[in-house]
Amino acid sequence: MSKSLSFKTYSAKPGEVERSWYVIDADGQVLGRMAAEIARVLRGKHKPQFTPHIDTGDFIVVTNAAKIGLSGKKTEQKSYFSHSNYPGGVKFDHVKDLLKKKPEKIIEHAVWGMLPHNNLGRQLFKKLKVYAGPEHPHASQNPVEMKVN
């Protein structure tokens, strides 16, 4: 007789997921390509234990968010729309203003759009840490440097 094979699909359990810490330097990186890779790692799709309904992803620390690269004329032309739900409450935030005031928000907005918009997505988003400068307070977690192509 041959060995018996198990044809059961593996499903990760929340307690048995091992999480790693990665650090990404955003200096000169293209926003969309970097955000797609960050969303993939936050979701856990780079692991063989990926389970769609369980948080199997890792932590990501992004540094130098103020030096992010945008292709084309997006620095001058791109803007983010929001509304307060009050009459006349339309607000546009332009990218060149956000790069000066809150450069972290640009990366966070791009990654948030690539994550699921449900409870799992909110849980995944909490594992993203973005900092405008090169320093971050997560050195004690020993993050591994991650290259984004």
UniProtKB/Swiss-Prot annotation:
CDD domains (alphabetical): Ribosomal_L13 (cd00392)
UniProt GO MF annotations: mRNA binding; structural constituent of ribosome
Listed InterPro entries: Ribosomal_uL13, Ribosomal_uL13_bac-type, Ribosomal_uL13_sf
One GO CC term, this protein: cytosolic large ribosomal subunit
Keyword Kinase in record: no
Pfam family, one: Ribosomal_L13
Disulphide bridges, residue numbers: none
Gene3D superfamilies with a match to the protein in the record: Ribosomal protein L13
Alphabetical keyword list: Ribonucleoprotein, Ribosomal protein
GO BP annotations listed: negative regulation of translation; translation
Function statement: This protein is one of the early assembly proteins of the 50S ribosomal subunit, although it is not seen to bind rRNA by itself. It is important during the early stages of 50S assembly.
UniProt subunit comment: Part of the 50S ribosomal subunit.
Protein family membership: Belongs to the universal ribosomal protein uL13 family.
Name the record gives this protein: Large ribosomal subunit protein uL13
Protein's organism: Chlorobium phaeobacteroides (strain DSM 266 / SMG 266 / 2430)
Name of encoding gene: rplM
